[in-house]
Swiss-Prot record:
InterPro entries: EF-hand-dom_pair (IPR011992), EF_Hand_1_Ca_BS (IPR018247), EF_hand_dom (IPR002048), Parvalbumin (IPR008080). This is Parvalbumin beta 1. One of its GO terms (molecular function) is calcium ion binding. GO terms for cellular component: cytoplasm. In muscle, parvalbumin is thought to be involved in relaxation after contraction. It binds two calcium ions. The keyword Acetylation applies. Keywords: Acetylation, Allergen, Calcium, Metal-binding, Muscle protein, Repeat. CDD domains: EFh_parvalbumin_beta. Belongs to the parvalbumin family. Ca(2+) 1 binds at D51, D53, S55, F57, E59, E62. Residues 38-73, 77-108 form the EF-hand domain. Disulfide bonds: none annotated. It comes from Merluccius productus (North Pacific hake).
């Protein structure tokens, strides 16, 4: 799904780094998978994959399963990890993350 945008080796390393519950940190993950240095267009493509229901927003249930976008066998995020991730990205407080919020969160 991420072919041409992200390297498989980077995805594997990033997933390995947050395999244990409670170890997912979105900033570190975005850096490890090589997303931080990508163009806005590439980030938008990644957002489109994560936005499973194509609502133009990533909601809490999609964030919980965030890692599974990168590998079907990856774990779900814990409720605490999901809440932290949502809070970090949801700058307007509407309970979901839009593409501009997602881009801002990655670019940090």
């Amino acid at each position: 799904a991420f072919a041409g945008i992200l390297a498989d080796a980077d995805i594997t390393a990033a997933l390995a780094a947050c395999k244990a519950e409670g170890t997912f940190k979105h900033g570190e993950f975005f850096t490890k998978i090589g997303l931080k240095g990508k163009s806005a267009a590439d980030i938008k493509k990644v957002f489109g994959i994560i936005d499973q229901d194509k609502s133009d927003f990533v909601e809490e249930d999609e964030l919980k399963l965030f890692l599974q976008n990168f590998s079907a066998g990856a774990r779900a995020l814990t409720d605490a990890e999901t809440a932290t991730f949502l809070k970090a990205g949801d700058s307007d407080g509407d309970g979901k993350i839009g593409v501009d919020e997602f881009t801002a969160m990655i670019k940090g």
